[in-house]
Amino acid sequence: MEISTRTKQLKAIFSYDKKVILEDQPLEIRPYHFIQNMGVNEIEQFQQLLPTNEFCSIPDNNIQENKSFSYTIFTPKGSRKTNQAILLLHGLNERNWDKYLTWAEYLSLATGKAVILFPIAFHMNRTPGNWYNPRALMPWVARRKQEVEHLNNSTFVNVALSYRLSDTPLRFYISGKESMFNLWQLFREIKT
């Protein structure tokens, strides 16, 4: 099957809310909820120092979508516990898991291991909804193109990240540290 066709099929059934059993493969996609608790005080101390801006008037430490969110695991059908898993992270500016779904499916089928799709801080489903709404973001894209000379490739996909990091580059470090704490917590939760 062509990869673009399979990507569309997986995208159509992917859910953060309910378990999906792949009818044509011996796999299922299970959603799990994550509530950040490891490193919270340290991260909040940093985040409280960050200024808000016109793009986002909510302080980083008050963005609830970043603290409590869902992640998914591709796993062989019916398996309960495995000794090994593959952690699949994403790149910057990613808004959805679409292109990673076929990768996760392939890795799980080829290895027999669970594949965890875990979002890094302030990406994917860890952001307010208006950060990935094209209609809401297009005025910001136009504004960004006016503010930054020779900027030709600004799109709604990267405008949230661009505004937030240009305004306060320290956000990149703090988000990385927050993601590290989240992964540490995830690994501890998986082991118990």
Mark where each language-model region is.
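Generic low-polarity alpha-helical segments
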Residues: 56-62, 116-123, 176, 190
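Short, surface-exposed "cap/lid" segments of acyl-processing enzymes
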Residues: 70-146
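Short, charged/polar micro-motifs that form catalytic or ligand-binding hotspots
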Residues: 61, 87-101, 166-176
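Alpha/beta-hydrolase active-site loop
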Residues: 134-191
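Alpha-helical context
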Residues: 65, 83-84, 91, 98, ...
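Charged, low-complexity, helix/coiled-coil-prone segments
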Residues: 43-54, 117-123, 127, 161
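Repeat-unit-sized solenoid/scaffold elements
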Residues: 1, 191-192
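N-terminal cap/lid segment of alpha/beta-hydrolase-fold proteins
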Residues: 3-5, 12-81
